[in-house]
Curated annotation (Swiss-Prot):
<dbReference type="GO" id="GO:0000166">
    <property type="term" value="F:nucleotide binding"/>
</dbReference>
<keyword id="KW-0548">Nucleotidyltransferase</keyword>
<dbReference type="Pfam" id="PF03431">
    <property type="entry name" value="RNA_replicase_B"/>
</dbReference>
<keyword id="KW-0696">RNA-directed RNA polymerase</keyword>
<dbReference type="GO" id="GO:0003723">
    <property type="term" value="F:RNA binding"/>
</dbReference>
<feature type="binding site">
    <location>
        <position position="360"/>
    </location>
    <ligand>
        <name>Mg(2+) 1</name>
    </ligand>
</feature>
<dbReference type="GO" id="GO:0039694">
    <property type="term" value="P:viral RNA genome replication"/>
</dbReference>
<feature type="binding site">
    <location>
        <position position="360"/>
    </location>
    <ligand>
        <name>Mg(2+) 2</name>
    </ligand>
</feature>
<comment type="function">
    <text>This is the catalytic subunit of the viral RNA-dependent RNA polymerase complex. This complex is involved in viral RNA replication that produces (+)-stranded genomes via a complementary, (-)-stranded intermediate. Binds RNA cooperatively with the host ribosomal protein S1.</text>
</comment>
<feature type="binding site">
    <location>
        <position position="274"/>
    </location>
    <ligand>
        <name>Mg(2+) 1</name>
    </ligand>
</feature>
<feature type="domain" description="RdRp catalytic">
    <location>
        <begin position="259"/>
        <end position="391"/>
    </location>
</feature>
<dbReference type="InterPro" id="IPR043502">
    <property type="entry name" value="DNA/RNA_pol_sf"/>
</dbReference>
<dbReference type="GO" id="GO:0003968">
    <property type="term" value="F:RNA-directed RNA polymerase activity"/>
</dbReference>
<feature type="binding site">
    <location>
        <position position="359"/>
    </location>
    <ligand>
        <name>Mg(2+) 1</name>
    </ligand>
</feature>
<keyword id="KW-0479">Metal-binding</keyword>
<keyword id="KW-0547">Nucleotide-binding</keyword>
<dbReference type="InterPro" id="IPR007096">
    <property type="entry name" value="RNA-dir_Rpol_cat_phage"/>
</dbReference>
Amino acid sequence: MPKTASRRREITQLLGKVDINFEDDIHMSIANDLFEAYGIPKLDSAEECINTAFPSLDQGVDTFRVEYLRAEILSKFDGHPLGIDTEAAAWEKFLAAEEGCRQTNERLSLVKYHDNSILSWGERVIHTARRKILKLIGESVPFGDVALRCRFSGGATTSVNRLHGHPSWKHACPQDVTKRAFKYLQAFKRACGDVVDLRVNEVRTSNKAVTVPKNSKTDRCIAIEPGWNMFFQLGVGAVLRDRLRLWKIDLNDQSTNQRLARDGSLLNHLATIDLSAASDSISLKLVELLMPPEWYDLLTDLRSDEGILPDGRVVTYEKISSMGNGYTFELESLIFAAIARSVCELLEIDQSTVSVYGDDIIIDTRAAAPLMDVFEYVGFTPNRKKTFCDGPFRESCGKHWFQGVDVTPFYIRRPIRCLADMILVLNSIYRWGTVDGIWDPRALTVYEKYLKLLPRNWRRNRIPDGYGDGALVGLATTNPFVIVKNYSRLYPVLVEVQRDVKRSEEGSYLYALLRDRETRYSPFLRDADRTGFDEAPLATSLRRKTGRYKVAWIQDSAFIRPPYLITGIPEVKLAS
């Protein structure tokens, strides 16, 4: 056996103890120990974890940062014993959003807008936004571009469950389609000729409305779309995403919003606006008013007119689409950007300050209040808790800033039941409690307390930050288990055990064929956009997680270069 392989096997055995358990309420103990170390009150109940008030902005950065962590750390925990029927709460919000869209459709259908000054202002913004959208995307739909960008997602459809959600299975199995979308499938089939076999399972009128876990207070409602509808929806979404780049809005990159939020917290010239249930509040009439007729017809043809609830009830949608639709994210980004830019134009404010990522909106502070008036007029509800127009705090796209300082909290989202869960939490404490690897001594005491609960060898095994949470993040140069081979470092990490699930070779071929077509012909697709593609599309099996963990090895991509050619390559020895 080669020396490297022998050493890897030896280390794998040393780190083999991964089945350990923790107390049920250890998440609360970790949080309260942190608060005690920083001298702030502990959390006494599950209700307090999710209902802690936003901290005062009239204090220093360090104090705010800790109090903000207290308000957020367990706010998204999914195991609080609150006795709330989270599914019922989700459906209540879903039906409320539908009622809101119905009222918006009626309001926007009125002919006389001039009776009220706000409505007159709203009408001006809508007409300006319509003109901007027309100029951006054109009057006619570029069906050729849409066809080149159509693809299946990796999720469930009305005919295929999540387990078989990979595109290769969807190409191999007949998929559902709605009656109005069927003509696009026929046209696509004629364009492909005999190269692909596009089969239909059922022609239907509805999608499936379901809930997925969100937090301890409520679930989240989404829709599972017919497979072929999703195929074309994603093509439309990709084209809209391309067009938005002409406004310097890149939906593949959150860093622009994050950077602008930092600048806004420092200079107070930009506001961050967040909307509640944004994707469930895009009414049909609003889309009809804003989009060119041909685009509107396409969007309505590809949507599902109805949704089937788990209890069998059928709901006729008042909104254009919901979470789960393939073009929802791009469409809402387009609408919010157009409205925001229109408000700026009418107020004679620089439109370049507008940046949008979904329902995360950044705009000049002077335009924030008029923009929120328009949003309320067209049926959206600003989330006042996450909207910041004045003061030293801003938040956007997962980054939180106070006077230009990163105060982003970390979250404990689920119970800590295994070694992998504890490593994730300890790494979160490390990232929150260090600056360039230098510890805040208050956070270090808590980190070291819970570090002792890990097996000894896992305490010593460290990997560089940026390589996931399969091991503790830290000073990797002292890791006794690292293996240096061909000027690269190999690190042992925890990975979830996976099993192979066979898939159709025919479906794999079609997936590879259409995927390569997209990467070859799209003029907008950059190298960074290709990272989400399956690297082995023709493999005859896929990996499925099992909930168990084992030791695997990752390779450090950093090339170890000798400092001088004369001295040669430095020798790196492993600790015994």
